[in-house]
A protein has these predicted regions:
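A short beta-loop-alpha structural element at the N-terminal edge
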Residues: 11-25
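A generic structural micro-feature
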Residues: 77, 96, 151-155
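Residues within well-ordered alpha-helical secondary structure of globular protein domains
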Residues: 27-31, 135
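Acetyl-CoA-dependent GNAT
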Residues: 16-20, 30-93, 99-108, 112, ...
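Short acidic N-proximal helix/loop "leader" segments that mark the beginning
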Residues: 1-8
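Conserved N-terminal glycine/acidic-rich loop preference
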Residues: 71, 77, 83, 101-102, ...
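C-terminal "cap" of GNAT-fold acetyltransferases
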Residues: 115-119, 123-130, 135, 143-164
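Conserved beta-strand core positions
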Residues: 12, 81-83, 118
């Protein structure tokens, strides 16, 4: 997928996460921890892309460089999928990479699971992410607060992308 921001074209693609990507993902999670609570799929044992078990997990590649991760997962028995995405450092923000990655991951997921809504939670203070999700078609459907292990309480929005 090609996109442009500020006149600079960026080629964005996805590749399935493999077990040997975990060290990079852990390092990237350190950057993302300041603006999101969850940097991995819900299945704590997951370490790779596994569509047969409902996990579509990808490394985001921009201009040939690994720059983040995106996942769509369908927990067993769930009536909606869950989306997560993050980029590895601030230099990649605001370039359209997140929106492109979400669209690519959703296309793969929906080829196997048409007609399911996709949900996420995003910190209310994360305006850049909220704008990204809105560009991808998500709408705010509710709000709440989450208590972090540190004791901090973080307000969030629930967002949903309706089925196609």
């Amino acid at each position: 997928m090609r996109g442009a921001l500020g006149g600079v074209e960026v080629v964005t693609s996805l590749r399935p996460v493999a077990e040997d990507d975990q060290a990079d993902i852990q390092r990237w999670a350190g950057f993302a921890a300041g603006h999101m609570s969850r940097t991995h799929p819900l299945d704590a044992d997951a370490d790779r892309h596994a569509p047969a078990s409902g996990l579509y997990w990808y490394v985001i590649v921009a201009d040939g460089r690994d720059v983040g991760t995106v996942w769509v997962e369908l927990p067993p028995g769930a009536s909606e999928a869950v989306l997560g995405v993050f980029l590895c450092d601030a230099s990649h923000l605001g370039r359209g990479l997140g929106t492109a990655a979400i669209e690519l991951a959703l296309a793969e997921f929906r080829a196997d699971h048409p007609g399911l809504p996709v949900a996420l939670r995003v910190r209310r203070a994360n305006e850049r992410a909220i704008a990204c999700y809105r560009r991808a078609g998500f709408t705010v459907t509710g709000s709440g607060t989450k208590s972090l292990p540190s004791g901090e309480t973080v307000p969030y929005y629930s967002m949903v992308l309706a089925p196609c």
